[in-house]
Amino acid sequence: MTGGDQLIPVGTAARYDVFHTACPARDVVDHVTSRWGIWVLISLQSGDLRFYQLRERIEGISEKMLSQSLRALVGDGLVWRRVEPTTPPQVTYGLTEFGRDVGEPLEDLFGRITRRLAPRGADQS
């Protein structure tokens, strides 16, 4: 931990102060809630996927943005990456235990949102 990390004692354990700009947990939150990070986590909740499967599932994401999002989530320990030594290489991604813990409430949140929205095409007046 660097000198800028802020810990606040809570009970017997120390917790990160996510309101401090140097807090490493803040970076993880930024990656999870980024435009594409949240969709990657939600997509991987259903099981391991290859890069092209993720790209097809997440409509509108470019290869560049998918690569950047995956790199950040792998670096945060939320997603694992496995490369098969084939030609071309097959790269598979899945959620770590940490990633599943973070992804479950996101799925619940999306479920709550979609249950409360009016059906598509319904009069919004």
Explain the meaning of each model-derived region.
Residues 19-65, 92, 123:
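N-terminal helix-turn-helix DNA-binding core of bacterial DNA-binding proteins
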Residues 64, 81-83, 89:
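Catalytic cores of DNA base-excision repair glycosylases
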Residues 74-84:
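A short, conserved structural fragment
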Residues 50, 70, 114-117:
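Short, basic amphipathic alpha-helical segments that act as recognition/interaction helices
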Residues 38, 76, 102-120:
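Alpha-helical linker/hinge and terminal dimerization helices associated
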Residues 1-14, 20:
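Long, low-complexity, charged/polar intrinsically disordered regions in eukaryotic proteins
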Residues 85-106:
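Basic, amphipathic "hinge/linker" alpha-helix immediately C-terminal to the N-terminal HTH DNA-binding motif
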Residues 66, 70-73:
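Basic amphipathic alpha-helical segments that dock to polyanions
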